[in-house]
Amino acid sequence: MRRKALVVFTALIGMLALVGTGGAADKKLTFGIGISAPFAPFVIAVEKGFMEKRGVPAEYKMFESGAPAFEAVVAGSLDAGMVSEFIFVPARAKGAQISLVSLFTVTGKDLGAVVSKNIKSPKDLEGKTVGTAVRTSAEYFMYKYFEKHGVDVSKVVVKNINPTETAPALFRGDIDGFFLWGNWVPKAPEVVPGARVIAYSGDDNVYIQKQSLIFNTNSLKANRELVGKSLLALMDTIKFIKEQPDEAAAIAGKAFRLAPEEMKKQMAPLNYVVELKGSSINEYKASTRWIVGKGGVSIPDIDKFWSELVDASPLKAVAPGQTDL
């Protein structure tokens, strides 16, 4: 009897200790997301129950965009977020404790170039003024586009411009074109007579835009098994999106307060993936060299930088076929 009581007492002490230290048993993964189509799978994974089915207590918190959500990840108040290298590379170079665990959104149909009626070919941009958001994926696409089409960038006036000002500036003639992302691209020709989309970044394989799933490193270390299960849940979600696009769009649209038809339209050009491939890392290294060249961050050894940033172990543990690292 005394032995049985001792066993029960010991078990109770163990349970209290687990609760008191916030152990894995009561951990909930919190994803910071922007209110836009690239983040739709996180909403669907939670609301449709894919996270729960994989044994992952999870929630999402919405921000205006991925950038402020990422800042919360760096601060340690959220577990994970999703941004491009133009945000996470400078942060990591400045000491942010973050780990890249998977590529997530890939598209060649988000970044685009809009030009005025006077621009008939890429070379016509020489001697003209072009707007973009500097030090972002949009500016990187611009330089890759110029390189592809033999445009001498030294002959182009590049103006840093707020996205909300692009169409008005094009209308007034303050700029002759702009490179940007999202709805700013297709909407401009609707309000600026003669304007047109001259190219998207994926045309001629100029630049394929990527966003990756970034975890706070301390959270990853403390919840490695949960992180692996969450990757499986996201893979389940992506399969559902492909098989049931209407229902998927309705779920995401409700959270983002968008009509299902509009949500579906915005999700359509996006390729959601859970993978880590060496080819993608090599492309990331190329853009990292450009980021360093723009100034503001110093990365003496880019290969070492990326080997320390990427952690393929959670994906290897649950879906080894999704990574060749």
Q: Which residue stretches match the model-derived regions?
A:
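Bacterial N-terminal signal peptides that target proteins for export
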Residues: 1-9
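Bacterial N-terminal signal peptides
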Residues: 9-17
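Sec/Tat signal peptide C-region and signal peptidase I cleavage site
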Residues: 18-24
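Short, glycine-/small- and polar/acidic-enriched structural segments
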Residues: 25-152, 157-162, 176-182, 197-201, ...
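Solvent-exposed, polar/charged alpha-helical surfaces in well-ordered, non-transmembrane soluble domains
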Residues: 40, 44, 48-49, 71-75, ...
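Pocket-lining segment of extracytoplasmic ligand-binding domains
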Residues: 86-87, 159, 164-254
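Secondary-structure end/capping motifs
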Residues: 221-298
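Conserved C-terminal helix/tail region of periplasmic/extracytoplasmic solute-binding proteins
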Residues: 292-325
